[in-house]
């Protein structure tokens, strides 16, 4: 049956498949495929031999890997180049490649193209992983990158085998507390605290359970189907086999839980030493890196979790197959469980201790500072300050040096006592000088020197008592009250003593003023009586002009004396302490009030009725008074209706401005200012 003819428009260009070079290429690919099939068959046979013997290992050499890569390069050289034109010598190259690649034995081919995972060859739970299979499509085409990875993997495997050999040659770390293959309690006590019986039994059972599965190996057939993480059922079958092989040892070597010195415990130690002597336990390189990277706490946790997993698988396998021996195996299970529990308690206790030690301990000063800040935020302030200066220095010293010897504290107390006695003696001397009448300046110098040397002496109430007693009796009460306020602000203690002293000073001042007022009233009354008697004795025959001139002369003398006394007071600063009005002189004024009374009107009528006295027409009193500057300034701005009806003059020259020249004035002393006139009379 012939195919229909294709039109020329739809015909494709002639293909290059008919050329000899591409035919040779297809023939080469077929030959490589057959060679790969032979290689896989040889690898399966070798794998069976390795699983049966378990002592042969595949060693890859660098030369063999290079030969394998050369073969792969020749195989992939003409791939995907069907439609490209090649030079004429390509056929010769392929022929040379064909004749240069002889068939190699199956062992060499497997070494060059097959990678076998030799990590942990003694571990029964890990099997070699096949990279190439018959049904895998990737195994039929090997690229350059795959060849490169193959070479690197072979180098890595070679390095791991060398490391394992070095680890095997290294000396084994001795067991702590062991002597001639047995653990001695006295040696353990020499480097750690003695553990409880439960801890000892759990440690012994842990060591026994750790050495038994590594010492006894399962059948080589099962190793190809057993893995550590993924295949759980095969792991359980493997564990049941080695537990069944070592069940006699576990029955013979059953350790007691509560007895310290029993024969069975010695047999446990002997069994442990015997198994550990026969078997060398090594860890793979990956496990080493993990153990080095982890901390001590994480290693304890991982070991405890691994112990728990091992206990679970062991208990399940025993329950499934070895049912006739429940007592011995349950004891082993209990003792193995006790070990991770104790480890967890130890790690938890350690973590708690570390967390407590990591937290900084708060000092008493910090607590006081936080308390004061909280009180300030709430608006609470201490009403009563601390007791004294002396007692405040002691807690600060105690906080800085909490641990001091007995003799140093005694010496500090003696020094503090002497210091307090010295300050108290100084204040008592000042009080004695005040009572004796010593000048104020000397006492102030002594007190100021004491305050310069000891600034905290202001917190003692005796200092403020001395200042209050220095003030003269004639000083105003405001000065005493100001001293009392300063003492309260400084925190003087005890403040009750200061209160009693202030009360005594005020009572003395009030009594002195009362006595002075009585004396001045008596003197004023006597002067008025003398004047009346002199007027009555002279009678109406007295010349009014002479009387007026005498009164004016007397008044001028009095006012001149008063002015001189005021000038002397302003010039003499020491006299300010003795007079009560000097401090308030700037705020007050002394003026003369011009007023009249019915008594004066009657006297005036008598004089006018007599007819002989026609020189003066008005008779008025002239009284010295004290007026406030502040009030005078305010009243001067008021209208005339609200001003005082009795005018006040500041000098005698202003009397002519008030009235006529015929007015007569009688000087009348003021009881409140009678001391001024009393002093003028005495001078």
From Swiss-Prot:
InterPro entries: CKAP2_C, CKAP2_fam. The modification Phosphoserine is found at residues 178, 190, 534, 595, 602. Its main location: cytoplasm. Residues 1-28, 153-175, 214-236, 336-403 are annotated as: Disordered. The keyword Mitochondrion does not apply. One of its GO terms (cellular component) is cilium. It is found in: Cytoplasm, Cytoskeleton; Cytoplasm, Cytoskeleton, Spindle; Cytoplasm, Cytoskeleton, Spindle pole. The modification Phosphotyrosine is found at residue 599. One of its GO terms (biological process) is mitotic cytokinesis. Induction: Up-regulated in primary human gastric cancers. Residues 219-236 have a biased composition (Polar residues). PANTHER family: CYTOSKELETON ASSOCIATED PROTEIN 2-RELATED (PTHR16076), CYTOSKELETON-ASSOCIATED PROTEIN 2 (PTHR16076:SF8). Possesses microtubule stabilizing properties. Involved in regulating aneuploidy, cell cycling, and cell death in a p53/TP53-dependent manner. Belongs to the CKAP2 family. Associates with alpha- and beta-tubulins. This is Cytoskeleton-associated protein 2. It comes from Homo sapiens.
């Amino acid at each position: 049956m012939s195919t229909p003819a294709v039109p020329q428009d739809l015909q494709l260009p002639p293909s290059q498949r008919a050329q000899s070079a591409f035919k040779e290429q297809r023939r080469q690919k077929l030959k490589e495929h057959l060679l790969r099939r032979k290689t896989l068959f040889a690898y399966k046979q070798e794998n069976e031999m390795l699983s049966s013997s378990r002592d042969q290992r595949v060693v890859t050499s660098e030369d063999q890997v290079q030969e394998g890569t050369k073969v792969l390069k020749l195989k992939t050289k003409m791939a995907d180049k069907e439609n490209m034109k090649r030079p004429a010598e390509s056929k010769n190259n392929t022929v040379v490649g064909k004749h240069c690649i002889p068939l190699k034995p199956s062992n060499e081919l497997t070494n060059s193209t097959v990678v076998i995972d030799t990590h942990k060859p003694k571990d029964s739970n890990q099997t070699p992983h096949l990279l190439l299979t018959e049904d895998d499509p990737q195994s039929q085409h090997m690229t350059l990158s795959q060849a490169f990875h193959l070479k690197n993997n072979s180098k890595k495997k070679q390095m791991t085998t060398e490391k394992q050999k070095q680890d095997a040659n290294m000396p084994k770390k001795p067991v702590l507390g062991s002597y001639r293959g047995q653990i001695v309690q006295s040696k353990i006590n020499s480097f750690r605290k003695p553990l409880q019986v439960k801890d000892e039994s759990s440690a012994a059972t842990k060591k026994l359970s750790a050495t038994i599965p590594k010492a006894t190996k399962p059948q080589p057939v099962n190793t190809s189907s057993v893995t550590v993480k993924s295949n759980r059922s095969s792991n359980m079958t493997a564990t049941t086999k080695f537990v069944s092989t070592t069940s006699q040892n576990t029955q013979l070597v059953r350790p007691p839980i509560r007895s310290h010195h029993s024969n069975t415990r010695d047999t446990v130690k002997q069994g442990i030493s015997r198994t550990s002597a026969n078997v060398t336990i090594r860890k793979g390189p990956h496990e080493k890196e993990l153990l080095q990277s982890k901390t001590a706490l994480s290693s304890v946790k991982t070991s405890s979790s691994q112990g728990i997993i091992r206990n679970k698988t062991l208990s399940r396998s025993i329950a499934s197959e070895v049912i006739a021996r429940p007592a011995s195996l349950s004891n082993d299970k209990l003792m193995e469980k006790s070990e991770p529990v104790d480890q967890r308690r130890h790690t938890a206790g350690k973590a708690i201790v570390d967390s407590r030690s990591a937290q900084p301990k708060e000092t008493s000063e910090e607590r006081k500072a936080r308390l004061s800040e909280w009180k300030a935020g709430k608006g609470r302030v201490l009403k009563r300050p601390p007791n004294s200066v002396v007692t405040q220095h002691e807690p600060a010293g105690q906080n800085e040096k909490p641990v001091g010897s007995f003799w140093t504290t005694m010496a500090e107390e003696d020094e503090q006592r002497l210091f307090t006695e010295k300050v108290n003696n100084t204040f008592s001397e000042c009080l004695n000088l005040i009572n004796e009448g010593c000048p104020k300046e000397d006492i102030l110098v002594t007190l100021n020197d004491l305050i310069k040397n000891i600034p905290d002496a202001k917190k003692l109430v005796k200092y403020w008592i001395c200042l209050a007693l220095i003030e003269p009796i004639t000083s105003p009460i405001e000065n005493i009250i100001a001293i009392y306020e300063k003492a309260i602000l400084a925190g003087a203690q005890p403040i009750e003593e200061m209160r009693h002293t202030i009360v005594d000073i005020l009572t003395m001042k009030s009594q002195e003023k009362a006595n002075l007022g009585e004396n001045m009233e008596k003197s004023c009354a006597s002067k008025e009586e003398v004047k009346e008697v002199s007027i009555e004795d002279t009678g109406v025959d007295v010349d009014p002009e002479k009387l007026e001139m005498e009164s004016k002369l007397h008044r001028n003398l009095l006012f001149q004396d008063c002015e001189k006394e005021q000038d002397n007071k302003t010039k003499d600063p020491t006299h300010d302490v003795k007079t009560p009005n000097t401090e308030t002189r700037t705020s007050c004024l002394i003026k003369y009030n011009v007023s009249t009374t019915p008594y004066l009107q009657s006297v005036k009528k008598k004089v006018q009725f007599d007819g002989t006295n026609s020189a003066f027409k008005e008779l008025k009193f002239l009284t010295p008074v004290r007026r406030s500057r502040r009030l005078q300034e305010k009243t001067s701005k008021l209208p005339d209706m609200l001003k005082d009806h009795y005018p006040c003059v500041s000098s005698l020259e202003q009397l002519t401005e008030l009235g006529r020249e015929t007015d007569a004035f009688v000087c009348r002393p003021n009881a409140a200012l009678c001391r001024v006139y009393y002093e003028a009379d005495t001078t």
